[in-house]
Swiss-Prot record:
Protein name: Hemoglobin subunit alpha
Record GO terms (molecular function): haptoglobin binding; heme binding; iron ion binding; organic acid binding; oxygen binding; oxygen carrier activity; peroxidase activity
All copies of domain Globin, residue ranges: 1-141
Function: Involved in oxygen transport from the lung to the various peripheral tissues.
Tissue distribution of the protein: Red blood cells.
Keyword Transport: yes
InterPro entries, sorted: Globin, Globin-like_sf, Globin/Proto, Hemoglobin_a-typ, Hemoglobin_oxygen_transport, Hemoglobin_pi
The species this protein was found in: Psittacula krameri (Rose-ringed parakeet)
Assembly and binders: Heterotetramer of two alpha chains and two beta chains.
Annotated family: Belongs to the globin family.
Any one biological process term the GO annotation gives: hydrogen peroxide catabolic process
Length: 141
């Protein structure tokens, strides 16, 4: 459960990310594909090489989903309901991949915003990314 402080920290981090969110999403995907190559199996039709147009486009979707969740942090489940349906019913992504991508996103944020990612902010962002992952896997059966 995200505390009031967690919510404030997450909103602060996303305000600092600003217009770079799409790039962060793509960089997180690139990092995930290299660090956890088994995740590429869900993207057989993608050019998963760093900087590819497809990775950038999907990174934009990832960033959009995370930004949507941050903007509706008091009701992440409702804000990501359609994405949850898509991932559970159509794409059938292994739920562990949300955790892996979340870890990669956290690393990207840390690389680009080291002063903003205090230990407290780090913990809050990690809790937020876990909450997003839980929402995205809630409709799995």
């Amino acid at each position: 459960v995200l505390s009031g402080t967690d919510k404030t920290n997450v909103k602060s981090i996303f305000s600092k990310i600003g217009g770079q969110a799409d790039d962060y999403g793509a960089e997180a995907l690139e990092r995930m594909f290299v660090t956890y190559p088994q995740t590429k199996t869900y993207f057989p039709h993608f050019d998963v090489s760093p900087g590819s147009a497809q990775v950038k486009a999907h990174g934009k979707k990832v960033a959009g989903g995370l930004s949507e969740a941050a903007n509706h942090i008091d009701d992440i489940a409702t804000s990501l309901s359609k994405l949850s349906d898509l991932h559970a019913q159509k794409l059938r992504v292994d739920p562990v991949n949300f955790k892996l991508l979340g870890q990669c996103f956290l690393v990207v944020v840390a690389i680009h915003n080291p002063s903003a990612l205090t230990p407290e902010a780090h913990a809050s962002l990690d809790k937020f990314l876990c909450a997003v992952g839980l929402v995205l896997t809630a409709k799995y059966r």
